[in-house]
């Protein structure tokens, strides 16, 4: 954790690790600032497990605590994720856009709510397919970029 209040002088607050680290690529904090979701871009390839989104309790920035992981039903690489209105929008390369509910995050559980597969051939842990997803349009539209597939403009119907 780094305090960047003064951009010219960043200050480390704390540092931690977790079992099975590959390459921490991207994180996002929940709106209440109690939890952090983390994508590790290489763990699926290095350790041969399914897509894992790490969940951290960051209520105490001096002692962030890894409370669990959401493990998906595909081995695709997780790349970029964002949180909006109680959902996680996660670009998982060959598994496409995955939408997860946040309502049980304190129990370290993320529940699948929907998906759109931009690479239907397979879900292998390779670097093609959904690169990112942008869920912040006021209309509810989600833009998903596929590395070779192009741009998908979606309007998810989430129950």
Segments (PLM) and residue ranges:
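Feature marking well-ordered beta-strand scaffolds used for ligand recognition
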Residues: 1-159
